[in-house]
Amino acid sequence: MRALILGLALVLAPLAAQAQSLTVVAADGKTKVLTAPDLADLPRAEVKVTLETGAKTYEGPILAYVLRAGGLPVGPKLHGDPLRAYVVMTGKDGFQAVYALAELDKDFHDDVVILADHVDGKPLPEKEAPWRLASGGDRKGWRSVFGLARIEVRMADAPAKPSTMDHAH
């Protein structure tokens, strides 16, 4: 029996570790895996979210700092081409939501988006854990990705350079 329990622990341990990790992929393909301990010391915030289901207070790391920990350009580094970036957030169930990268940066946007790990002073319910996105500025919960597992930055195509013929009258 002890061998069976040990065997199950060895099989399930990687799954538990995977469930407690967040993969961050930069636009150039560089990938960084963040774990709960990586996120534990990042600056945190509370966000009050009022949706049709009622008001709740979420708490967790500020997403801009999570992005920085994942090697993404935020703050003073977010200028020029990175302003064309958008972020695809994917939950463990495959649900996705999209944000503009600048929308997640407190230097560009007043609304704070967090990687919530608590709601109303308690850990998230299992269906939303280990993290979910929470934004006080959204009026609908459609971008509240539960069980956030992946953050991937993609670049919008650069606009074609206009030719002199495009401006002829």
Where are the regions a protein language model picked out?
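Bacterial N-terminal signal peptides
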Residues: 5-14
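N-terminal intrinsically disordered, low-complexity segments enriched in P/E/S/T
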Residues: 18-169
